Amino acid sequence: AFKRALVGARAVAYSRAGASGIYFTALVERLGIASEVLARAVAIPMGFTGEKVASGEADMAIQQVSELMSVPGVAVAGPFPPEVQTVSTFDAAIFADAANPDGAAALMALLASPAAAKAYGDGGLVSRLPHS
């Protein structure tokens, strides 16, 4: 279904220089559909690919969910299927010689809080912490 959607789209928007676009071009190559999909693609140098869907220039946009959600008028269909999905992770640590280790610890506690997990979810991100 995923491959059919990509091949069947009039145009797919992706960011040429962004991490999602770099992954996408490699993925369509791996799936054997690059020539069909990229020939009709709308590649943008930077910015939000969802804007190309909102303007009618593309049927689909490829980008991180959090970026797609920020474009008014765009409905996010969902993430890629698990077998072709890639995940970006963000981690935090306190250096042994940190100038303000207590402040850093407080920030990390805030970032790991249930309130932060809710904010991540509201913004299209998924927390990997146990309470999320």
Label each residue range with its predicted role.
Residues A1-S132:
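Exported/periplasmic ABC-transporter solute-binding proteins
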